[in-house]
Amino acid sequence: MNLLQLGKLHENVLDAGCEPNRNARYLASLGYKVVGIDISERAISKAIDKTSSEKSNVNFNQRDFSRLNEFKGHFDTVIDIGCFHSILNSDHEPYTASLSHICHSDSSVFLRAFSETNKSRYRRWQGHKRYSLALKRNNVKKLSL
């Protein structure tokens, strides 16, 4: 994971769209406090089953991505690997608005989504621009695409 090598991850991590939960479990094994969320009940059940025999610092929650403001406290790091471009376009703004509630001024949000470089393969490549603009409108200051 390059973010680790670059020292970009900080103590409290949210893994948005955590299936198949490898990142959440790996970061927890390194001592990070991790919350993995997914809208899929099946994905969360599988994640809980996988970690039930492990001693880890990860908590999995089924969660509507537009209701992250229900979390108490803030996250230092948010990792979104495939969540944003998997939700409906109409949910992009509520999702990014909810991120602003769980991020503090020094939080970092890392997004892996479709980009201009692969637009011939994917029709929704413009999503990264909407995400970036929505995050900025909602006062999330640090964004890496």
From Swiss-Prot:
CDD domains: AdoMet_MTases (cd02440). Gene3D superfamilies: Vaccinia Virus protein VP39 (3.40.50.150). GO terms for molecular function: methyltransferase activity. Keywords: Methyltransferase, Transferase. Its EC number is 2.1.1.-. GO terms for biological process: methylation. The keyword Methyltransferase applies. The keyword Ribosomal protein does not apply. It holds the Pfam family Methyltransf_25. Signal peptide: none annotated. Belongs to the methyltransferase superfamily. Probable methyltransferase. This is Uncharacterized methyltransferase C750.03c. It comes from Schizosaccharomyces pombe (strain 972 / ATCC 24843).
